[in-house]
Each structure stands twice: as structure tokens, then as C-alpha cells.
Amino acid sequence: MFFSLPVLTVLIPLVSLTGLLYSASVEEDFPNGCTSTASLCFYSLLLPITLPVYVFFHLWTWMGLKLFRHN
């Protein structure tokens, strides 16, 4: 089952916000516990930044191919 880009654009921040709120309510050392990769808080902060970085570098590569191709 694959989701389209607009659905993922809305779904990923909502899921990560839910995980962040869950981490804030459950974990005792919430701000300091976000550095461990075993923590749900780490991934809820990582997911929203992953998609824009991927889109940026994908477009950067495409522009590089368009502008600097040799005929």
C-alpha cells in the first residue's frame, strides 16, 4: 500500500506530533531523552525533517542534470 505525496505530507507530521505528545506525557526525562535512538521522541523529531531534506536534494539533483548536461 503506497501513499501519495500530499497524503504523506499531512500524515508524517501528524504521526510525529502524536509521538512527540505521547513522549512528553509518558517519559520523565522528556527533553533530555530525545537523544537516544531507542526513544520514540527521537524519531518523532526526525520524521518531519526527513521529507523536506529528501525533496530538496532530489530537486537539487534534477536541477543539476537539467542545467549542466552536455549536448
UniProtKB/Swiss-Prot annotation:
Signal peptide range: none
CC terms in the record's Gene Ontology section: endoplasmic reticulum membrane
Bilayer topology term: Multi-pass membrane protein
Lumenal side stretches: 22-44
Subcellular location field: Endoplasmic reticulum membrane
Residue ranges of the TM segments: 2-21, 45-65
Segments on the Cytoplasmic side according to the record's topology features: 1, 66-71
Pathway(s) where this gene product acts: Glycolipid biosynthesis; glycosylphosphatidylinositol-anchor biosynthesis
Keywords: Endoplasmic reticulum, GPI-anchor biosynthesis, Membrane, Transmembrane, Transmembrane helix
The keyword Endoplasmic reticulum appears for this protein: yes
Keyword Transmembrane helix tagged: yes
Listed GO biological process terms: GPI anchor biosynthetic process
Subunit structure: Component of the glycosylphosphatidylinositol-N-acetylglucosaminyltransferase (GPI-GnT) complex composed at least by PIGA, PIGC, PIGH, PIGP, PIGQ, PIGY and DPM2.
Function: Part of the glycosylphosphatidylinositol-N-acetylglucosaminyltransferase (GPI-GnT) complex that catalyzes the transfer of N-acetylglucosamine from UDP-N-acetylglucosamine to phosphatidylinositol and participates in the first step of GPI biosynthesis. May act by regulating the catalytic subunit PIGA.
Miscellaneous: PREY is derived from the same bicistronic transcript that encodes these 2 different proteins.
Name used for this protein in its record: Phosphatidylinositol N-acetylglucosaminyltransferase subunit Y
